[in-house]
């Protein structure tokens, strides 16, 4: 695997970083976070102009490395725009499985005019499970869905949903549902993101593409989303570490900077080690997808390291900042909240370990 970014990918990173750095500081983030939407339509339009909202829609290009680059920069600035969950992940499903009519949605998504959301998670669901209790029923070639989806990230603002449901003949199907047809209850997550619960009561739905069992396509989308979360977490960890080291260099105690105390610098060094472990696993997971390998074991390894590194860096960043680290006006607590939320999205540490333990039986025994 070649872990070097191309010139185009470096340019995409630099343009995204410049746009977000120019837009977001802690005051702006707090102000935007208090709005009903929770993110900026103006920034969304800027991301569309850059070409970010259509990454990966081309069937000849995975776009996974570009997705990783963009999500890392979003994580670095704590940008609340739902690039992955309201555009790239559900849009990628439509690009892969949708029919010609449904693919017309992709131009609107890429231009920032339409928001999609993947409604797959259900109460009690853990990790990358594709088992759902929402039922799909067909009568006279018309499909209806019944069930509950929660949490649906960006479900509060989506114009259309890609909904997973159990098929009568077995397997899991994917359906396009208009937002006006569902009963949704928006809520705010503890890290300031937006989500919703969808109550589906015989809601009219259109099969995505030719219909039938879409389990494989759904699994690929979930693995892509997990990789995107890993990339976002790496960006957040990078900035949390930078803020912490800057604080240690500037804050004085007993007449000298805190960075002069060896114990504190060693703790910062341990944070750096955790960051590099997370970065390498995130890159590895993205590269595997870019090469066509949607391996849940690779995804679990990456997410496990992200969970561990994120928890370590978030906790140490707050501890090394002292009391200011938990104030709302200072950014480090918000980075800790986002890293904690990412650690629980699409599977916690325990869920990743469960996946890895379950895969052990496939390696066989070693004879000496």
Whereabouts are the PLM-identified features?
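A generic structural signal for well-ordered coil/turn residues at beta-strand boundaries
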Residues: 112-114, 130-132, 157-159, 171, ...
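Alpha-helical interface subdomain recognition
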Residues: 1-78, 97, 112, 138, ...
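A short, Trp-centered hydrophobic/proline-enriched beta-strand micro-motif
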Residues: 112-123
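N-terminal glycine-rich flavin-associated loop
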Residues: 79-100
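Flexible, small-/acidic-enriched active-site or ligand-binding loops
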Residues: 131-133, 151-152, 178-210
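Short Ser/Thr-interspersed hydrophobic loop/turn segments at strand-loop and sheet-helix junctions
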Residues: 51, 71-74, 177-181, 203
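Short Gly/Pro-enriched turn/cap motifs at secondary-structure boundaries
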Residues: 84, 124-127, 152-153, 166, ...
